[in-house]
Amino acid sequence: MKNNDLNYNLHTFYYAWYGNKEIDGSQRHWNHEVLPHWSNNTWNDLPDFPGGDDIGANFYPKLGNYSSNDLSTISKHINMIKRAGIGVITLSWWGEDTFEDKNVKLIMDIADAQKIKVSFHLEPTKDRTAEKVVKMIKYILDNSNSR
């Protein structure tokens, strides 16, 4: 795909909060509750998921129980996004020194190499104020090699 085939008006969310035992030492976010289906109740009777290969999701990811800190996984995700023609990823971000903060620079570098832009969704942290949001934005600009 050529760079001019990317649509910069088309954004996708990217949740880099998944961890696995091999990369991160433990499972992370794979065993969250499955949200109720909005129109098909047959999906609402699924058992609880303990994590591991039996993950908390209706569909098993093609790349398996991956880590969001794995270079190969991030590269594959960014390539999938590029093949779809999506020009911007929006990172879900919970703030400085969080699990989701560890891989921001890596994601941005891989996305930049593919000419994909990155924006941030500042998740609703506890006791968030306008001043804290300003500090979060300043941190992103200072630490992510913003382009």
Placement of each model-derived feature along the sequence:
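Glycan-processing catalytic domains of CAZymes
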Residues: M1-R147
